[in-house]
Amino acid sequence: HLRGVFSHDGDSYSAKDIETARRKSVIAQERTLKFAKMCRENGFDISIVGIGSTPSLANDSDILEGITEIRPRTYPFMDAFQDNAMNHTWNCNAFVLATVMSKPTEERVILDVGAKGLTMQSRSEGICAVEGLGNLIDYPDTHIDLMYDEHAIIYNKKFHDSVKVGDKVRIVPVHICPVVNLYDRMYLIDEKGDVEKELTIACRGKLQ
């Protein structure tokens, strides 16, 4: 039984500015509403018409009449993409904790997390453009430069001189959505850095 239709205006991620993202959102909504109308005209009782995505909806895009749900799904956590789209005014709430494993040169630092823990996603254009493959939240202007399966490399002398082998660092993923799906558990941390609760990732491995 078909109850509804939904769309995701993913091209808003590459919009050159906020106004363009808003226009893309309206176009996507109009297209989705048109498809819902076609379904109804062909005998389907469509009660749900849903839209995304976070870059446009979080920047106050208009919601057209007939839209019944919105899905800015990155909103609870945010990430480096959205941090840029929001002009660095929103807090990122999800981090990957990594360990400094090696400092083999005067500016190179190697961490114990790689593509299997952060993904290789990046974006070079648009409001969600980022530099590097993950931001180090506690070290301004520091990002991951290279990444392999199980380790990441940072070329930054200031960061190099600020950490020692064994230190823990918090990484803001470039795109949090696939990162959450890479882990079995996540931890809620209070303002002091203490673990308040361990959560199981309910949708882990549910893609098949």
Show where each model-derived region lies.
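Active-site loop/helix belt of alpha/beta enzymes
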Residues: H1-M86
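Solvent-exposed alpha-helices and their adjacent loops that cap or buttress functional pockets
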Residues: E41-G43, D62, N93, S102-K103, ...
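Active-site loop ensemble at the mouth of alpha/beta enzyme cores that anchors a bound cofactor
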Residues: A21-K24, P55-L133
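Generic structural signal for well-ordered, non-membrane alpha-helical segments
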Residues: A21, S25-T32, N93, M147, ...
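Short, glycine- and charge-enriched coil/turn segments that flank and shape catalytic ligand pockets
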Residues: K16-E19, L64, M86-T89, K157-K164, ...
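C-terminal accessory subdomain/extension
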Residues: P104-Q208
